[in-house]
Amino acid sequence: MTLTVAALQYCASDDAAATLHKIEPLIAKAAKTAQLICLPEAASFLAASRAQLSERAEWENDSASMKKLAALARQHNVWLLAGSLFLRRCQDRKLVNRGLLFAPDGQVIASYDKIHMFDANVGDGQHYFESNSFAAGSTPVIADLGDIQLGMSICYDLRFAHLYRQLARDGAHILTVPAAFTAVSGAAH
């Protein structure tokens, strides 16, 4: 199977609805030629603080962003990889950085919670401690796109080769690494 892929590169605002409105025409344009459209980590919003993150994270079972992305996948009849959304788990109220793959019918067929948290001082005067905000995932995920198996990861997972070896051993044909690096850490990658 041949799969045409489009990667949308943009920086989300701090407002999920505004970000998703902004990318609608980008998805429509990409869908004219691509079968799989990939969005970055933090696909719907970026928070300026832990308090804002906690306030704006959507419940995993009632996410307006998930509903909108499902509708866009369905409308354009494409696979749509939301690099990640910041969601609140129902069972324990913890936040997760979750990648989601929507099928052309709008159903979520795979979800992956980022395993490796970015806890670092990167040299820009900032300190990043994702583990203070997010619960880490524990399970590698491969999504079935028919003839193609897609291995999911997010951003800082990139630093941990064992994850990609496992995904490859388990049959992944494509490895995705949606990311929202800082300016300093992005230049290093």
Task: Enumerate the predicted regions with their spans.
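Extreme N-terminal starter segment of soluble prokaryotic enzymes
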Residues: 1-6
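Active-site catalytic loop in hydrolytic enzyme cores
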Residues: 90-170, 178-189
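Structural motif
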Residues: 35-36, 150, 174
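His/acidic metal-ligating clusters that form di-metal
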Residues: 30, 167, 173
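Cys-nucleophile CN-hydrolase/nitrilase-fold catalytic domain and related Cys-dependent amidase chemistry
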Residues: 16, 24-105, 111, 182-189
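Short polar catalytic/cofactor-binding loops
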Residues: 9-14
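Short, acidic/polar
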Residues: 18-27, 158-165
